[in-house]
């Protein structure tokens, strides 16, 4: 619809609103619906026309008017509430004198109404409500998108989510499913004896991940602060304090780019288990994902963007190096060693920075040639120590850590490891991160002296993991973009 036409309709609706104000309040707030459309349909759809007439069942409903057909003294209206739609049958003889012509006919699609009436079935067999009383609860001034074209512009859907939710059942179902998944995850960890906690969103030192933070300033304390990039270091402080199993579901903030898989503000669950290993967490994660598929989606086989993801089978487990060799059959193990890795990467078209060590080069090769090919649930293990500043070194090979990442449909969904609890080793790794930051890497970590102090009190052997809730919801709702599963995703400034 052109802006000019839209503005004309808005002016017309404002004129109707002025007339409605003269005869009453077009924003009534004392109507209490007792029924939902979908509940009514589920309970009474099996009744015959005669059975409904005998039952004389009165219901009351409130919602948005999505269709209105005036046929003289009779009108048909479709009302949509949070559960679905139902048809209303409105006749002038059931309403107060002159109400039908002077008020009801001035109502528009998009208005919010409340109605009381008796259930019946039309001659076509559609379950409907024969109205005894109907009220305007909110007059809508902006017209909804046309019923045939709906709201198809993706950018408008993201910017005006309120309209998207009105018009698109798929969007409504996506966010209902998101809520179900988060509740399921919370119950899953409660059932496994984890304690839910809350840690600071504003931090004096942003830690727990390699990412660029958002900065702010605390006026009363007269100090710079940062929106957290991860709760990890605070959750591990709780492990040190004796809380052996903790989890947190909350927002993280990373001052990075936008993509179909990245939003600067996103939801994660992080959880930590004392006396556990990264193997324990892989087992727990596999159980969690399989349970979500079965209990929330109804099947261990979940279709995502045309691919059948099998959550019933045991998830594949393979190391970083072995996965590179598997998906690059022309390479051999020595192509990835200290002597040859840089040349191998350059042959693959990867630009190498001078300060990169072997571990960073191997990860770049992995991300370039392997990551997007990991369709089925796969744990990638044995990440290099160089790119794992908070993970425990492997006992047999200090070049690698006891770390994994879970990939599904070519996307990283989870990251976990046995935690580094050697305070001296952690201090040295923090120092290396600071050196990288001084060289211009603004995603490197800060030195967190208080966390080192906490580690010096002793942290028990611990494993921890973070799972991206938004990406997980993408999988279980078949959503191609992270913006489809975040109610109000970040967008570039709107061009007026």
UniProtKB/Swiss-Prot annotation:
Question: Main site of residence?
Answer: cytoplasm
Q: CDD domains of this UniProt entry?
A: LysRS_core (cd00775), LysRS_N (cd04322)
Reactions listed under catalytic activity: tRNA(Lys) + L-lysine + ATP = L-lysyl-tRNA(Lys) + AMP + diphosphate
InterPro entries documented for this protein: Aa-tRNA-synt_II (IPR004364), aa-tRNA-synth_II (IPR006195), aa-tRNA-synth_II/BPL/LPL (IPR045864), Lys-tRNA-ligase_II (IPR002313), Lys-tRNA-ligase_II_N (IPR044136), Lys-tRNA-synth_II_C (IPR018149), NA-bd_OB-fold (IPR012340), NA-bd_OB_tRNA (IPR004365)
Please give one Pfam family short name.
tRNA-synt_2
MF term (GO), any: ATP binding
What positions does the entry give for Mg(2+) 2 binding? 412
Q: GO:BP terms for this protein?
A: lysyl-tRNA aminoacylation
SUPFAM superfamilies for this protein: Class II aaRS and biotin synthetases, Nucleic acid-binding proteins
Write out the annotated subcellular location: Cytoplasm
The protein's matches in PROSITE patterns, at most eight in alphabetical order, are given as: AA_TRNA_LIGASE_II
Residues binding Mg(2+) 1: 405, 412
Which residue spans traverse the membrane? none
Q: Does the keyword Metal-binding apply?
A: yes
List the GO cellular component terms: cytosol
Describe cofactor binding as the record notes it.
Binds 3 Mg(2+) ions per subunit.
Q: What Enzyme Commission number(s) appear in the record? A: 6.1.1.6
- Which coenzyme or cofactor does it need? Mg(2+)
Alphabetical keyword list: Aminoacyl-tRNA synthetase, ATP-binding, Cytoplasm, Ligase, Magnesium, Metal-binding, Nucleotide-binding, Protein biosynthesis
Task: Report the domain of life of the source organism.
Answer: Bacteria
Question: What is known about its subunit structure?
Answer: Homodimer.
Its family remark reads: Belongs to the class-II aminoacyl-tRNA synthetase family.
Task: Note the HAMAP family from the entry.
Answer: Lys_tRNA_synth_class2
This protein's name: Lysine--tRNA ligase
Q: Which organism is it from?
A: Vesicomyosocius okutanii subsp. Calyptogena okutanii (strain HA)
């Amino acid at each position: 619809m052109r802006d000019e036409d839209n503005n004309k309709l808005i002016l017309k609706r404002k004129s109707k609103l002025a007339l409605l104000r003269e005869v009453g309040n077009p924003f009534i707030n004392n109507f209490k619906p007792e029924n939902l459309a979908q509940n009514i349909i589920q309970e009474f759809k099996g009744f015959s026309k005669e059975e409904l007439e005998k039952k004389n069942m009165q219901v009351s409903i409130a919602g948005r008017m999505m269709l209105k057909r005036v046929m003289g003294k009779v009108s048909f209206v479709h009302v949509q509430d949070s559960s679905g739609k139902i048809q209303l049958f409105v006749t002038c003889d059931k309403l107060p004198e002159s109400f039908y012509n002077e008020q009801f006919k001035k109502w528009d699609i998009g208005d919010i109404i409340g109605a009381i009436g008796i259930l019946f079935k039309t001659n076509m067999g559609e379950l409907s409500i024969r109205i005894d009383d109907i009220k305007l609860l909110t007059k809508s001034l902006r017209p909804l998108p046309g019923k045939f074209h709906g709201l198809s512009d993706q950018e408008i859907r993201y910017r005006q989510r309120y309209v998207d939710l009105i018009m698109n059942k798929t969007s409504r179902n996506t966010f209902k499913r998101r809520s179900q998944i988060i509740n399921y995850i919370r119950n899953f960890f409660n059932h496994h004896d984890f304690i839910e906690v809350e840690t600071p969103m504003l931090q004096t030192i942003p830690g727990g991940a390699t990412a660029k933070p958002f900065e702010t300033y605390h006026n009363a304390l007269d100090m710079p602060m940062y929106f957290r990039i991860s709760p990890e270091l605070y959750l591990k402080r709780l492990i040190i304090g004796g809380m052996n199993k903790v989890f947190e579901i909350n927002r993280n903030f990373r001052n990075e780019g936008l993509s179909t898989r990245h939003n600067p503000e996103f939801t994660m669950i992080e959880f930590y288990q004392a006396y556990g290993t990264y193997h324990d967490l892989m087992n727990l994660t596999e159980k969690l994902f399989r349970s979500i598929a079965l209990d929330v989606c109804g099947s261990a086989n979940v279709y995502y963007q045309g691919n059948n993801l099998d959550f019933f089978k045991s998830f594949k487990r393979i190391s970083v190096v072995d996965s590179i060799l598997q998906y690059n059959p022309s390479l051999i193990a020595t192509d990835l060693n200290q002597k040859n890795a840089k040349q191998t990467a350059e042959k693959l078209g990867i630009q190498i920075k001078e300060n990169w060590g072997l571990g960073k080069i191997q990860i770049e090769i992995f991300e370039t040639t392997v990551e997007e090919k990991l369709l089925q649930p796969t744990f990638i293990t044995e990440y290099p120590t160089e790119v794992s500043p908070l993970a425990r070194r492997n006992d047999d090979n200090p070049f690698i850590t006891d770390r994994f990442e879970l990939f599904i449909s070519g996307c990283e969904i989870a990251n976990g490891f046995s935690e580094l609890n050697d305070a001296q080793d952690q201090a040295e790794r923090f120092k290396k991160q600071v050196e990288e930051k001084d060289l211009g890497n603004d995603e490197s970590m800060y030195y967190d002296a208080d966390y080192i102090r906490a580690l010096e009190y002793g942290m028990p052997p611990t494993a921890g993991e973070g799972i991206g809730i938004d990406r997980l919801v993408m999988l279980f709702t078949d959503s191609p973009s992270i913006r489809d599963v975040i109610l109000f995703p970040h967008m570039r400034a709107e061009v007026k």
